Amino acid sequence: MDPKLGRMAASLLAVLLLLLERGMFSSPSPPPALLEKVFQYIDLHQDEFVQTLKEWVAIESDSVQPVPRFRQELFRMMAVAADTLQRLGARVASVDMGPQQLPDGQSLPIPPVILAELGSDPTKGTVCFYGHLDVQPADRGDGWLTDPYVLTEVDGKLYGRGATDNKGPVLAWINAVSAFRALEQDLPVNIKFIIEGMEEAGSVALEELVEKEKDRFFSGVDYIVISDNLWISQRKPAITYGTRGNSYFMVEVKCRDQDFHSGTFGGILHEPMADLVALLGSLVDSSGHILVPGIYDEVVPLTEEEINTYKAIHLDLEEYRNSSRVEKFLFDTKEEILMHLWRYPSLSIHGIEGAFDEPGTKTVIPGRVIGKFSIRLVPHMNVSAVEKQVTRHLEDVFSKRNSSNKMVVSMTLGLHPWIANIDDTQYLAAKRAIRTVFGTEPDMIRDGSTIPIAKMFQEIVHKSVVLIPLGAVDDGEHSQNEKINRWNYIEGTKLFAAFFLEMAQLH
């Protein structure tokens, strides 16, 4: 049998079986004939969808390295996306975001944010999709097995920078829209897009734009969808209802600006590095428990219902450990690992600026060093309170050393955690769409990382926000050999199409 016909038959069978099963659900079913046509279209055109992803991955839209060449690529990427949406019939505005001021005093233009609209039927609900088209730095010499900017398919895996974070999911949503358009079918819901090009650099100036547009562009929005994270397994889909926040700290210890010769001064100084190592060592113990007094005060007590949520999640610990390439985790059970990723704060030490870190030997005593660490915050933790607790703790530890050096603590980043109500109607619609496409219940997960835009939308726009990831846990976003599986990309396109139909049932 032709492989395409086989995929079509499998999709049709899954749809028919699941539509028969749907009598147990409270919401009406989407039109089965339309769903079948859309799925067939997506299967038949999947090679075209992969080709478009290849074209988008080829644009080196790196927002992290503030150099003119990459900034030009970012502008090109946003122009390509705007043109794609216009060809679908969307009303598109590319909003000028002004300049980005760099630490060295220079400035670079910020790529425009795309605000696009498809449909304005007052009888339909309006769903707004957020995505970003900038990527982390990538270089073949960093350990990539393929050119990071040439999408390469190996055993069903599509390797390339941005394939899963976030160009693939953005295109999956666009592909779902294009399927309805190609079949000359009305979109089940009104759709809006907000697409940026600076997420990897901290979404520069985006919050100001969202605030400015809350009573215009966002005024008719009923629901917001983000697809910018991963499943917790390789094969089972998930819905994300919470993320951790992030407080990033720097602690500077200084004797003088110049380094010292260890033969001349070793043994007669309060060495800044020794002070700093003691400070960093006071933050967290060998079991991962944070030693800062008061840090756990706002962490909500664990409930039986929450424990049952963790038990229901599919997580193969051996698979997870192998895909992570670590010998052992701090905890031995699925439930403990999930809780310490999602519902408890964590503290990570990232590096020391000013220390000798090159090959060879260099017998200097650094005159000034800066330690860098961050705390991932969980819901109900307060960023300002954490800043005070950390500063107070480090000052207390430093005072006991009786050092003549100077210590300065600063929090350079303070991003809030986010959590949503999983009984919200949008979440129930997403669950039904996942059942239709994948034939299984989704894992209801949180994300241990930080996605500031979710909290931003929740606080400014005051609408339901859901994260619907498409990529597998081993996609390697931000790392070498980032990929998205062809299966995830294509089935994710179907998921968004089914989601449109489910959301239509809410109005």
UniProtKB/Swiss-Prot annotation:
Residues that coordinate or bind Zn(2+) 1: 165, 200, 478
Ligand binding (Zn(2+) 2): 132, 165, 228
pH dependence: Optimum pH is 8.5.
Record has ATP-binding as a keyword: no
Glycosylation site residues: 322, 382
Catalytic-site annotation from UniProt: 134, 199 (proton acceptor)
Transmembrane annotation, as ranges: none
Gene Ontology BP, a term: regulation of protein metabolic process
Gene3D superfamilies per UniProt: 3.30.70.360, Zn peptidases
Catalytic activity: Preferential hydrolysis of the beta-Ala-|-His dipeptide (carnosine), and also anserine, Xaa-|-His dipeptides and other dipeptides including homocarnosine; carnosine + H2O = beta-alanine + L-histidine; anserine + H2O = N(pros)-methyl-L-histidine + beta-alanine; L-alanyl-L-histidine + H2O = L-histidine + L-alanine
Gene Ontology terms: cellular component: cytosol; extracellular region
Top EC class of this enzyme: hydrolase
Purpose: Catalyzes the peptide bond hydrolysis in Xaa-His dipeptides, displaying the highest activity toward carnosine (beta-alanyl-L-histidine) and anserine (beta-alanyl-3-methyl-histidine).
Protein name: Beta-Ala-His dipeptidase
